[in-house]
Each structure stands twice: as structure tokens, then as C-alpha cells.
Amino acid sequence: MSDSRIKNSKRNLKSAIILQIINIILPFVVRTLILYKLGEEYQGLNGLFTSILQVLNLTDLGFSSAVVYILYKPIAIGDNDTVCALISYLKRVYRIIGIVILAIGLILLPFLKFLIKGSYPDEVNIYLLYLIYLSNSVISYWLFAYKTALLLAMQRADLTDKISSIIKSSMFIVQAVVLFVFGNYYVYVIFLPIFSIINNLLVQFVSKKYFPQITPHGKISENIKKEITKQVKGVFFNKLSNVCRNTIDTIVISSLVGLTSVAIYNNYFYIFTAIYGVSLTVSNCMQASVGNSIATEGVERNYKNLIKFTFIFSWFTSMCTICLCCLYQPFVKVWMSGNKNLMLSDFNMFLFCTYFYVITSCNIRNLYISGSGLFWELRLSYFMEAAGNIILSFVLGYYFGVTGVLLATIITIVLFNFLSRNRVLFKSYFQRTIKEYYIDHVLYLFVTIVNCILTYTICSLIHIEGMAGLIIKLLICLSIPNALNLLVYFKTKRFKEAFKFIKSVFIRKNKI
């Protein structure tokens, strides 16, 4: 990895971490205010509408991801004409997508009540609220959304993150004040499209300032169109699997169990997403750099980097999983003021931790799938995960409720995400045996389980309640697993390579 790629990754990581901190803390405050000022049914509605709109966003078909992938090469060789043509193409596509989302969203209006089992607040017009959420989604496509793709391909995700940090901070603060002072959910929701407009206008301004030579004009060649079409078909199924995994669960719980259960599930999922978001932030900051590396360096070099990055990330994943196991229930108990009716069982909590480990273990591998453009080759895997998750979630959810929904998600991730996608990556890009990669993962899993059992047992002996107990358990979670990991890995080749890489990043060596 060249010095420029390290520099870009470090810059993107710094801004992304700031954004992630904002995305964790401020929404938590807003979420808490909704629960305490309005009630769990309002939080359930928020989760349901958000999930529905994420499903509608499948209309994107993955054009942005496909175009960003195609942009890597012309950007690397300085072909601005092709870059401008691709941006112009994406601009036209986004306008069409916005129209389609609006049309489908309006068609769904009469069916909203069938997605809610039981009651919802009498004073709420669910159709009006839904239309506000829908307008927010449509605006995000119509107003300069294509400029975000340009900044990402240019390895300047730090710019979009800085804008998002400012806009989201402002929005969450305004929403919190509105909820605290007025307790009005309509006023809270109306700020979503308002701040989306401001965000997209700022992205346009910054993009024009940093890359004035890139304007949407020209036409792409037929060969590029064919390549985009091929990639989009694969990316769409990838998006389908991700959306089904992240949103179908909420819709299934709402339709089979009710809004209160959605609120409880989403409280745990919010914590899950916050920690997963941190892990995703770290890996996503490397995406453009990995894509550039795949475009300019050999397969063997990239394979060695995959093994090295997987080791580093597995250590991080293990730490996060152990922290979740030990701190999930104590934190929710403090958050919900000891109300056990708003808490999941310990078994479901452990399922959430398992869910976190299996999905986060795929993060580094996903960088190489995206960077090598294997979306088309993985179309069947994506489709099977999506279809499997939908079917299993409804079947197991019907019989076992939230437990069944979580089990369905874990099963489909292991079968069609971890195992299936690994096989395709090694067969189509690395073209070598996957044995070494799986041996590493088995070792990392075994060490994580031992670590987790030991740390959880020690934490269970701490009977101090409240924030003091949380802090003590957090210190235990940060010390014992790291010490055991260091003991196990210190003399291994993986540790030495990882340490050398981390050291080179911080002292800005030219090569790793």
C-alpha cells in the first residue's frame, strides 16, 4: 500500500470516527427522549417507517456502488473525460430512482396499517408521518446525490463525513430540543427532509470547490455501460441481502408481534448498530485504498494484506463481541431505569452478540469483494441470503418471536454470507485454496469464545449496580481479553506482521 493510500485511509478514518461518535451519542439522546416523552410505540413507528424506506431504496439497484467501482481506474490514470461522463450518467439515473421511489411509496400508503399488529397512538396520522419519511428519501436522490459518489471514488470520504458530522449534529440537537420542549413527533420528523436538503447542498459546494474540473457532462461508451449493467445486477442482490438482513426483521416483528416489541428489539439493535458502525467505519475507510491497490498491484500482495488485515480486525471484533456480552444487559437496565418489560432475555442478548460476531467477521473480506468487483459472480449468494432470511424470519418468527427472527438472521449469514462469499472470492480473484484463511478464522473464534467465557464469568461476580458497575465491567472487558490475546498471539507471524503495519501507519513509512 503506497504512502498516498495510507494518508487517505488515515484522513478518512479520522473524520469517520468523529462522525460515528456523533451517530452514537446524539441519536441515543433523541431515542431516549422519544421513549420517555412519547412512549415505546412512537419509537416502534420510527423503526418501522425507517425499515420500509430502506426497502424502497433498493430501487437504487446498486448504481452508486457500481459506478464508484468503475471510477477507480479512470481516476487512477487521470482520465477526467470518462469520470465526467460517469458522473453525468449517475446523475440521470438518480433522478429516475427518485421518481420510482416516490411512485412505489405512494402505492404502499393504503397497506401501512397491515404492517402493524395491534394498536398505535390514537393521535398519530401514520399516513402523514410516512409521507414525511418518504419525502426525505426522495430528496436525497434528487439533489446532488451523485456528488457523494465522486468524493468517495476520489478517496475523500473525509469531506462527506465532515459535512455529515455538522449536519447531523445540528439536526439531532434541534430534534432533541423540540422533543424536550414540545413533545411533538410531527415537528421532530419534519426536520429530516429539511436537513437532507442542507446536507446535499453542502456536498455540491465542497465537490465543486475541490474538484472543479469534474462536471456532469459527456456520454459513457457502450463497453462501460455493459460493465455497469453487469456490476449493477450483482450489486443489487448485495443490497437486497443487506436490506433484508437489516430491515425485514423489524417489519416481521411489527407484523407478527407489535410495535412495543419492535421498540424493544430496536433498542438492542441500536446498540448493536452503534458498535457495528464503529467496526464498519474502520473498514470502510480502507475501501478506496483497497480498490486502488487491487487496480494497481498483484494478487499475491493483496492476499497477504487480506490475511494481515483480517488478523487485526479479528482482534477488534473479538473485543467488541466480549464487551457486548458483558455490558449489553447492564447498560439496557440502566437505560430503561430497571424496567425489565423493556428488556430482552439473556438468551436473545447472546444471539445478538453471535449475530454481531458473524457479520463483523466479514467486513475485511467485503473490501476485497467490492474492490475486485465480484458483485455479478456473487449474485446467487446475495439472492439466497435475502430469500433465506425472509422465509426463515417469517417461519421462525411466527413460532418463536424475536428469538426466531435472530436465529434466522444468524443462520443465513453463516451459510450464504461467510461461507459462500469466501468461496467465490478465493476462486474468482485470489485463485488459491481457502484452507489457510479458514484455519485463521477457526483460531480467532476459539480464542474469542474462551476469552468471552472467562470475562463474562468474572463480570458476573460484580454485583455493583448503575454506572459504577458498568465502568468496572468495561475496564475488565478492555483488560482481560487484550491480555489473553497478547499471550496467545505475541510470538506468531500474524502478530508481527500486524504490529509492523500499525507501526508503519503511525510513523508514516513509505511501504508496508
Segments (PLM) and residue ranges:
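Helix-loop junctions and terminal segments of transmembrane helices
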Residues: 32, 61-77, 148, 152-153, ...
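Transmembrane helical elements of multi-pass membrane transporters/channels
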Residues: 11-31, 191-203, 207, 222-292, ...
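N-terminal membrane topogenesis motif
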Residues: 1-28, 81-89, 124-126, 203, ...
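Interfacial/gating helices of multi-pass transporter permease domains
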Residues: 33-55, 86, 189-190, 224-231, ...
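Membrane-interface junctions at transmembrane-helix termini in multi-pass inner-membrane proteins
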Residues: 10, 137-163, 186, 353-385, ...
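Membrane-proximal transmembrane or re-entrant/amphipathic helices at the cytosolic face
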Residues: 432-433, 456-512
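Interhelical loop/hinge segments that connect adjacent transmembrane helices in multipass membrane
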Residues: 1-9, 186-187, 203-247, 289, ...
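Interfacial segments at transmembrane-helix termini and the short loops linking adjacent helices
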Residues: 112-133, 325-357, 430
